[in-house]
């Protein structure tokens, strides 16, 4: 009887020790940052430069066309089930509120999935959001170039065998760009029209 009790005490003690070590190791191990955060939060890093892509009408779109306008830029893909449409809905609401406050701003959606997101697909998809949206795509090289300029990280998720049915993991930031095409600030899902207006007033 006493032998069984001692065995139980030893096992429980070992479990406590192992559990404690696991917690201590977890706390001491640096957490892996979210995609895109490694670069974007560094000081003095250059974000956003000139780019040229194809819009939802199949026309060449040069970023110089945004000169003279504030713009909000978001990177995503039309097959995204949740985060992308959430951001685009938020951007739609923000553009409406800013317009009501006499602040003109252009919403931009740049795909990270040019293989599936053709101009035709983008044109149909964006009907669900603000009519001022400009949707942009391009070839793989062009998309890689613009995502590098905005420090966006993205990668196809493993486990999808179908070449037309897959998911993409990616950074989720919305960029505020000034009238000269320069990066001002980036936001995450908590982006709001109020925050943008307050920020612009203090600029």
UniProtKB/Swiss-Prot annotation:
Domain Thioredoxin: 42-203
CDD domains to which the protein is assigned, alphabetical: SCO
Any GO MF annotation of the entry: metal ion binding
UniProtKB keywords: Copper, Metal-binding
Positions that bind Cu cation: 80, 84, 170
InterPro entries cross-referenced by the UniProt entry: SCO1/SenC, Thioredoxin-like_sf, Thioredoxin_domain
Keyword Hydrolase: no
Matches recorded under PANTHER family: ELECTRON TRANSPORT PROTIN SCO1/SENC FAMILY MEMBER, LINALOOL DEHYDRATASE_ISOMERASE DOMAIN-CONTAINING PROTEIN
Family: Belongs to the SCO1/2 family.
The protein's name: SCO2-like protein RT0576
């Amino acid at each position: 009887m006493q032998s069984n009790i001692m065995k139980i005490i030893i096992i429980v003690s070992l479990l406590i020790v192992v559990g404690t070590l696991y917690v201590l190791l977890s706390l001491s191990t640096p957490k892996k940052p979210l995609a895109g955060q490694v670069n974007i939060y560094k000081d003095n890093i250059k974000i956003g430069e000139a780019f040229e892509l194809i819009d939802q009408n199949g026309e060449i779109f040069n970023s110089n066309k945004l000169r003279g306008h504030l713009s909000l830029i978001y990177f995503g893909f039309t097959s995204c089930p949740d985060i992308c449409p959430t951001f685009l809905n938020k951007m739609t609401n923000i553009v409406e509120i800013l317009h009501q406050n006499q602040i003109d701003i252009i919403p931009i959606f740049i795909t990270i999935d040019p293989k599936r997101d053709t101009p035709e697909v983008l044109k149909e998809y964006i009907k669900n959001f603000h009519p001022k949206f400009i949707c942009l795509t391009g070839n793989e090289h062009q998309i890689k170039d613009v995502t590098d300029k905005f420090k966006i990280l993205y990668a196809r998720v493993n486990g999808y065998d179908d070449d037309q049915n897959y998911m993409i993991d990616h950074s989720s930031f919305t960029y505020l760009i000034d009238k000269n095409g320069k990066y001002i600030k980036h936001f995450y899902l908590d982006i709001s029209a109020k925050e943008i207006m307050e920020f612009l007033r203090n600029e």
